[in-house]
Amino acid sequence: MASQSLIQREQKRKKLEQKYHLIRRSLKKEISKVTSLNEKWEIHGKLQSPPRNSAPTRLHRRCFLTGRPRANYRDFGLSGHILREMVHTCLLPGATRSSW
């Protein structure tokens, strides 16, 4: 189980990313439209002004049961360990155990 501080930090990053999403997108569109190098540098400086944690690359996908940041399946929102346990206890309908 991930510590609560890490989970809270991730939630804070998600809120910041949503808050600054439109600003970042509009600045990136401006950069692509501008041809002058000096103007691009000015816009790039503005793009660096929002907080670092508002960047979408800082977000991690976490298991919603345990908070584990690794081995997550997008379709389920679960980590591999929890997914395997749920399949073994027949809590996920339609999922079958592989055998070869």
Curated annotation (Swiss-Prot):
Gene Ontology CC: chloroplast; small ribosomal subunit
SUPFAM superfamilies in UniProt: Glucocorticoid receptor-like (DNA-binding domain)
InterPro entries (alphabetical): Ribosomal_uS14, Ribosomal_uS14_bac/plastid, Ribosomal_uS14_CS
Positions of disulphide bridges: none
Annotated Gene3D superfamilies: 1.10.287.1480
Molecular function per GO: rRNA binding; structural constituent of ribosome
NCBIfam families hit by this protein: PRK08881.1
Function per UniProt: Binds 16S rRNA, required for the assembly of 30S particles.
Similarity annotation: Belongs to the universal ribosomal protein uS14 family.
Subunit text: Part of the 30S ribosomal subunit.
Protein name: Small ribosomal subunit protein uS14c
Protein species of origin: Fagopyrum esculentum subsp. ancestrale (Wild buckwheat)
